[in-house]
Amino acid sequence: MSTTARRRLMRDFKRMQQDPPAGVSASPVSDNVMLWNAVIIGPADTPFEDGTFKLVLSFDEQYPNKPPLVKFVSTMFHPNVYANGELCLDILQNRWSPTYDVAAILTSIQSLLNDPNNASPANAEAAQLHRENKKEYVRRVRKTVEDSWES
């Protein structure tokens, strides 16, 4: 069945293959274009550098008019990531636009890694450390990076 959402997701996948953004990759699971696996590489010169962070993107038939549900599968210590891996990111909620595609979602998440929004914390401990004790915050993030290599 070819729906608007499925056609759009196939176009997003084709674009990801033809013009992949630096440091991110994603593709649908083999038998379901509505469910994607993704990887974000931690940006250079940040505490997340060299991390390999896995995510899952779940789309429904309302995509692209409705954003996907995006969750980190990898453990993530970050002010804008809940304990269950879900993100607090404006473009996945009230700032969503149908013009965003999978590449834009992943590059936005990648830039959020080093530029958290402390005004909207999903992880209060990470937000507090980011504001008040950068050294401990970086130590915890580096542990997350090391853990990402094993998962």
Curated annotation (Swiss-Prot):
Signal peptide: none annotated. It is found in: Cytoplasm; Nucleus. Changing C88S: No derepression of transcription. Changing C88A: No derepression of transcription. Its main location: cytoplasm. One of its GO terms (cellular component) is cytosol. Belongs to the ubiquitin-conjugating enzyme family. Its EC number is 2.3.2.23. One of its GO terms (biological process) is negative regulation of SREBP signaling pathway. Residues 4-150 form the UBC core domain. The keyword DNA damage applies. The lineage of its organism: Eukaryota, Fungi, Dikarya, Ascomycota, Taphrinomycotina. It comes from the Eukaryota. Component of the histone H2B ubiquitin ligase complex (HULC) composed of at least brl1, brl2, rhp6 and shf1. PROSITE patterns: UBC_1, UBC_2. Keywords: ATP-binding, Chromatin regulator, Cytoplasm, DNA damage, DNA repair, Nucleotide-binding, Nucleus, Sporulation, Transcription, Transcription regulation, Transferase, Ubl conjugation pathway. InterPro entries: Ub_conjugating_enzyme (IPR050113), UBQ-conjugat_E2_core (IPR000608), UBQ-conjugating_AS (IPR023313), UBQ-conjugating_enzyme/RWD (IPR016135). It is an enzyme of class 2 (transferase). It catalyses: S-ubiquitinyl-[E1 ubiquitin-activating enzyme]-L-cysteine + [E2 ubiquitin-conjugating enzyme]-L-cysteine = [E1 ubiquitin-activating enzyme]-L-cysteine + S-ubiquitinyl-[E2 ubiquitin-conjugating enzyme]-L-cysteine. This is Ubiquitin-conjugating enzyme E2 2. Pfam families: UQ_con. The active site is at C88. Catalyzes the covalent attachment of ubiquitin to other proteins. Component of the histone H2B ubiquitin ligase complex (HULC) which plays a role in transcription regulation by catalyzing the monoubiquitination of histone H2B to form H2BK123ub1. H2BK123ub1 gives a specific tag for epigenetic transcriptional activation and is also a prerequisite for H3K4me and H3K79me formation. Also involved in postreplication repair of UV-damaged DNA, in N-end rule-dependent protein degradation and in sporulation. Required for obr1 ubiquitination, which regulates mating-type silencing. The keyword Cytoplasm applies.
